[in-house]
Amino acid sequence: MKSKEISHEIINAPVDTNVKFRTSIDPGSYIPMHWHRAVEIIYMQEGSLDVTVESENFTIRKGDCIVINGNVLHSTKCTSPNTAILLQIPLDFMEKYIPDLGQLIFLFDFRTKDQRLQTKQTMFKTILEQLQIINDVRPDGYLLRFNSLIFELLFQLYHNFAVKILQNNTSQEKKDMDRLEPVLDYISEHYREPISLNEIAKVACLQAGYFCRFFRKKMGITFLEYQNEYRLSFIYRDLITTRDPVHVILERHGFTNYKLFRRMFLEHFGNTPTQIRKQREIL
């Protein structure tokens, strides 16, 4: 949730737990479209978070929990401080215990009115709260309890929220993500520099025209729009965590068109950079 250099995020889970678990305290962040080879679970405890999963936009608030499937494009925006439980479970780890994982997606509708599903979701969130407690307190032998709770969570995820999908769809989606992965990695390494269309198309081993169509189809925006949104994520972070002048921050992250920056910033955050800083008492 908190902004860091992400496009295709590599989840390096600790060997003693095989998952990444933490209580996220986010002062404010914007993370553009990215994905990781892990199931991501976000359970809001304070504040709110704007989320986009593929083409669906929604806001989660205190008490809401969402499950984002692995290899699914998503973005998040936190415009005021929030606190959440964040759990990322690598697909490689899950596949050891769920052999048909590649044919499944997990449907966890936090807005459901179905009482049976609400009860199952409450049980799921209770395990997350127990994980948080044991992770914070860490008594002797805490890993025994922590890992047992992870397996209980996976059992519930598999039995209560898994839905089978067509194998052909998942196979093509994996091929597309494998092609997109080096592109987003390249952008994360060179986003401060001008990147030409021909340059980035070569990374994907595609002709420029086809690359444009492919990128827009998969990401929902053009390559240039994505590059500017990626820059914007770091600009927003620096804006709310430093006193550096706006023009210095823009130059640091390679955003050279100030007029375009102001328009994009206003569209994303509803205020000018000066207004955002005043709200956060940075000025």
Q: What residue spans do the PLM features occupy?
A:
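Short, Lys/Arg-enriched, Trp-marked, Pro/Gly-tolerant hinge/linker segments that flank
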Residues: 110-120, 135-146, 155-189, 193, ...
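Basic/polar phosphate-binding segments, predominantly the helix-turn-helix DNA-binding elements
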Residues: 188, 194-232, 244, 250-279
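Solvent-exposed, amphipathic alpha-helical segments
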Residues: 47, 123-137, 179-190, 234, ...
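Generic protein-terminus/edge-of-domain signal
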Residues: 1-61, 65, 72, 78, ...
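Hydrophobic alpha-helical connector segments
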Residues: 150, 245-246
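A hydrophobic/aromatic-rich effector-binding and dimerization subdomain
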Residues: 2-22, 70-136, 154-166
